[in-house]
Amino acid sequence: MHTVESLVMRKKNNILCIAMLVGLLCGCGKKYQYIPKDIETVEVEIVRFDSAQLAVRIDSVKQDIEKLYADYEEFMPMYVEGILRIPTEDTAYLCEMYAQFLTDTVMGFAQTNALAKEKFANVDSLQEALNTGFSRLHYLFPDWEIPAKVYLFVSGFNSSVMYYENVVGVGVDMYLGSDYPYYNQAAAN
């Protein structure tokens, strides 16, 4: 059962994807758009929700999840309902699934979580790329509201990017390389 918020988030994701596709198709006829080097710099904040997620301990899952709700009150409900597709009020099920998510080696979640933690330990280059990208986006579309924050999260192979109101989330486990072996296994299931 999906909530109104999750359906709205899906609709906004679909609209964003369509807008990006239209932009790509319309831009294909032009050679390129000149963007000056001295454009206004837009800085977005990267929020390391992924680090907090992976710091959850098996022996204190319930308390750690409650702490995630307290520390990330804006993002945690969107993550639980929109990415994990678990109703926020079903804490017992969330705790059970989260413990499995942290320890599962059959589907590769434990291995994937460890690799994501290692690969995204330093996000300085990602920060620079996001600032450059959003600066260019702001130059081309000055009326579009640039997200204030970009949350990094681990999705359990559920989502690579999410957009909701003024928040963007990036599933770091979906960016471990095209040859990452657990992608094929997840796709088969």
Regions found by a protein language model. Name each.
Residues Y98-N189:
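Acidic/His-rich structured neighborhood in mature extracellular/periplasmic domains
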Residues I15-G23:
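Sec-dependent N-terminal signal peptides
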Residues L25-G27:
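C-terminal motif of bacterial Sec signal peptides marking the signal peptidase cleavage site
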Residues G29-A99:
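N-terminal mature-domain "stem" immediately C-terminal to a signal peptide or N-terminal signal-anchor/transmembrane
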Residues V4-L16:
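Bacterial N-terminal signal peptides that target proteins for export
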